[in-house]
Each structure stands twice: as C-alpha cells, then as structure tokens.
Design a protein with these regions (language model features):
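Thiol/selenol-based redox catalytic cores and closely related redox-interacting motifs
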Residues: 33-113
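N-terminal non-globular leader segments, chiefly Sec-dependent signal peptides
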Residues: 20-27, 42, 48
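Short, solvent-exposed secondary-structure junction/capping segments
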Residues: 26-29, 62
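Local sequence-structure signature of Cys/Sec-based thiol-disulfide redox active-site neighborhoods
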Residues: 1-20, 28-33
Length: 113
C-alpha cells in the first residue's frame, strides 16, 4: 500500500486525512500542492480514478476566480490552468496506486486498509 496525500498546508480536511492514517499507523506521503504541484502522470491517474476534471477543481478558490477558469469552454485549457495553479485542486486528494479520492472520505479509505 502506497498512500499519497496531495493537499494544502492550511486545509483542515487535509489535516484530518493525515490524522486518519496516522491513527491507524499507515505510512503515507504528504505532497503540498502549493509547493510542489502534481505531475502530469499523477494528474492523469487521479483524473481517471475520480471520473473527471470537474470533481478535481475547487470552484470556490481564489485562484479559480482570478484565472477566469469558469469562462474557459475547452477542458484542455482548464487542465492547463489547473496544473499551472495547483491551489485550484479540491483537497485532499488521497491516492493509493490506481485508486483515488477527493475530499475527506474515510468510508472509502477503510476498504483500502
């Protein structure tokens, strides 16, 4: 099991996800999206597991508004903006190989353990 948590340092749900795995003594890797972002390969894997771009974007984020993403009609343009500005990701994104979740989802994570 190789758990990766992609999150933002000030996100409460990211901290809750960390706590969930710590309490169960499950090793995980924390990746700060604001600092390191997400590689294209990781992004494609997560997008396939989640079921689309719309579930990955945080439409309430300041970056989403500042970059006028809601006015972009082409999904490729939205993806480029998302990878350029990783703070627009909905967090936490928890990944276990080919499986992934967005948000605090302990009901799904317990099946991974």
């Amino acid at each position: 099991m190789n758990i990766q948590i992609f999150g933002k340092s000030k996100c409460f749900d990211t901290k809750k996800a960390e706590r969930y795995f710590k309490e169960r003594r499950i090793k995980y890797q924390l990746i700060d999206l604001g600092k390191y972002g997400m590689s294209l390969g990781e992004y494609k894997s997560v997008k396939a597991a989640i079921g689309g771009l719309s579930k990955l974007m945080d439409e309430t984020s300041k970056e989403y508004e500042e970059n006028f993403v809601k006015y972009l009609s082409d999904e490729t343009d939205k993806e480029e903006k998302l990878l350029e500005h990783p703070r627009m990701f909905q967090t936490p994104i928890v990944r276990n190989g080919k499986l992934a979740t967005v948000g605090y989802r302990p009901e799904i994570w317990k099946d991974w353990v």
